[in-house]
Amino acid sequence: MPTSNNYFHLHLVSDSTGETLITVARAVAAQYANVTPVEHVYPLVRSQKQLDRVLDEIEEAPGIVLFTLLEKDLVSRLEDKCKGINVPSLSIIGPVMQLFEAYLGAATTGRVGAQHVLNAEYFKRIDALNYTMIHDDGQHVEGLDDADVVLVGVSRTSKTPTSIYLANRGIRTANVPLVPGIPVPVQLETLTRPLVVSLHATPERLIQVRQNRLLSMGADSSSDTYTDRQSVAEEVAFARKLSAKHDWPLLDVTRRSIEETAAAIMKLYSDRQRNRPSE
C-alpha cells in the first residue's frame, strides 16, 4: 500500500531494454493522480545472479512488480520470491503470449530481445531519425519532398517532439514553422508526395506554454509579443487560413499528449497510404 507520503515503489524487470514495461507502467500509473510511483527499472536481466540482485532490492523496497521475462526458470524464481514476501507481481507479456499461442497453435521462439534485432525495420527507424533531425524547424527545405510527413504550425505546437516520436516509428518527418510576415517556403507549397499536417492549439494554451518556456530561460515575457494575446490570436488565425488554402488537415493539440498527437497523425498517414493509387 502507498505510504502516508502518497508514493509507492514500482519495480520493472526486463530481459531486454525495458521500454515495453516503462510505457505500460506509466500509462497505468497516470490514471492514479493521488499517488506517485518510485520507479526501479532493471533492464537486461538474463541470469539467476542478476535476478537475485533485483530480488534483494524488491525485498528492501516492496511494491508492485511488473516484468517481461521469457526464461521460465527466471519467471518461476521471481514469482515465488514475490509470493513469499507478499508482493504483487505480473507478467506484462505473459497473457498476450498465451493468447497468441492459443490462436496460432504454436509456442513462442523464446528469443530474448527479439523485437530489437538489427533488421530492416531497425535501420528504417535510424534513417527516419537522421532525416528528422536534419529537417527540424524549417531546415533544409529542399529535401521536404523526401519526407513521409511534414508538420507545420506556429511556435510551441509540439512540432519537434512529435516529429521525433514519429521518426522512432520509422516515419521520415520534417517540420516547418508558420510565422506571420515570413513567406512559406515554396518547396512546402508545392509538395505532393508527403502528408502535410497542420498542428494547432488555442491562443490560451500557446501563451501558457510560451510563458513557461520563457521562464525556464530566465526571460521576461511581460511585454513580449511572443505571449501577447492579440499577437498569438493573429498567429493562430494566420496558420488556420494558410492550412485551409492548401487543404492541409488540421490537428488540434491543445489537450493532446505527444503520443496522442502522433497516433492521430499515424492514422492519417496510414489512411493516405492505403488510399493512394499504386505507382
Swiss-Prot record:
GO terms for molecular function: ADP binding; ATP binding; phosphotransferase activity, phosphate group as acceptor; protein serine/threonine kinase activity. Keywords: Kinase, Nucleotide-binding, Serine/threonine-protein kinase, Transferase. Its EC number is 2.7.11.32, 2.7.4.27. Coiled coil: none annotated. The keyword Cell wall biogenesis/degradation does not apply. It catalyses: N(tele)-phospho-L-histidyl/L-threonyl-[pyruvate, phosphate dikinase] + ADP = N(tele)-phospho-L-histidyl/O-phospho-L-threonyl-[pyruvate, phosphate dikinase] + AMP + H(+); N(tele)-phospho-L-histidyl/O-phospho-L-threonyl-[pyruvate, phosphate dikinase] + phosphate + H(+) = N(tele)-phospho-L-histidyl/L-threonyl-[pyruvate, phosphate dikinase] + diphosphate. The keyword Transferase applies. It comes from the Bacteria. ADP binds at residues 153-160. Pfam families: Kinase-PPPase. Bifunctional serine/threonine kinase and phosphorylase involved in the regulation of the pyruvate, phosphate dikinase (PPDK) by catalyzing its phosphorylation/dephosphorylation. Belongs to the pyruvate, phosphate/water dikinase regulatory protein family. PDRP subfamily. PANTHER family: PYRUVATE, PHOSPHATE DIKINASE REGULATORY PROTEIN 1, CHLOROPLASTIC (PTHR31756:SF3). This is Putative pyruvate, phosphate dikinase regulatory protein. It comes from Bradyrhizobium diazoefficiens (strain JCM 10833 / BCRC 13528 / IAM 13628 / NBRC 14792 / USDA 110). The lineage of its organism: Bacteria, Pseudomonadati, Pseudomonadota, Alphaproteobacteria, Hyphomicrobiales.
